[in-house]
Design a protein with these regions (language model features):
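Active-site phosphate-binding strand-loop segment of PLP-dependent enzymes
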Residues: 141, 146-218
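Conserved active-site segment immediately N-terminal to the catalytic lysine
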Residues: 197, 214-233
């Protein structure tokens, strides 16, 4: 029997997916279950999206391979989104699309992380960061945030964990799983700290649109220098 590689053998299954599968099994048994596992919306896909997908199929727009970085119209729409939401002036050449944020993050770590590079991850965090970084032969470094500070990352905490091997900081805001948000001043402090310490920021903003009472803030919108030092998911 073929042997699984040592690299993959070190990787643990996704805890959230395991919880989700268990919840499905219990529901199938007739149990009343409230699942707090995967971040899955409780509403259907908006009809305008469904109709656009059907229309693209009928027009045979999906019959062929797309450009490696994604469909031009989609990349241009992403530029427009960030201009409208954050005032960020993006060019199409600065945008790449992926089959989901998980694959985008995996591609980022495989592209930027060399063996032994350290990647800072504030706790609590989305479980797959760890496995993806380890697949890239990087070293996840977990920052112990504090409940009394709403689990927020601070410059003081960053100073405790940074070393000469630190390559990246993963910042997830709005946060999965805590839901925390940062103020503009807090993000600016983190962004400037990253510049000072030559640490590149991977800003995971996939919950950007799921904030309803206050505006979301993108790390890349704070200054041109921080923009140049940030990759937004």
């Amino acid at each position: 029997m073929v042997k699984i590689s040592d690299r993959v053998s070190k990787i643990l299954p996704s805890g959230t997916l395991a919880m989700t599968q268990k919840a499905r099994e219990l529901k199938a048994q007739g149990r009343k279950i409230i699942s707090l596992s995967i971040g899955e919306p409780d509403f259907n896909t908006p009809e305008v999206i469904t109709e656009a997908a059907i229309d693209a199929l009928r027009k045979h727009e999906t019959d062929h391979y797309t450009p490696a970085l994604g469909i031009d119209k989609l990349r241009q729409a992403i530029c427009y989104f960030h201009k409208r939401k954050d005032g960020i002036d993006l060019q199409k050449e600065q945008v790449a699309t992926f089959a989901g944020a998980k694959f985008a993050l995996y591609s980022v770590f495989m592209t930027l992380v060399d063996p032994g590079d350290e990647v800072l991850i504030p706790i609590p965090y989305w479980v797959s960061y760890t496995e993806q970084i380890q697949l890239a032969d990087g070293v996840p470094v977990y920052i112990e945030t504090r409940e009394r500070n709403s689990f927020k990352l601070t410059v003081d905490l960053l100073n405790e964990y940074v070393t000469d091997k630190t390559k990246l900081l993963v910042l997830n805001a709005p946060s999965n799983p805590s839901g925390l948000l940062y103020t503009k001043e807090e993000l600016l402090a983190i962004g400037n700290w990253a510049l000072e310490h030559n640490v590149f920021v991977v800003s995971d903003e996939i919950y950007y649109e799921l904030v309803y009472d206050v505006p979301s803030i993108s790390m890349a919108s704070l200054s041109q220098e921080i923009f140049n030092n940030t990759l937004v998911i």
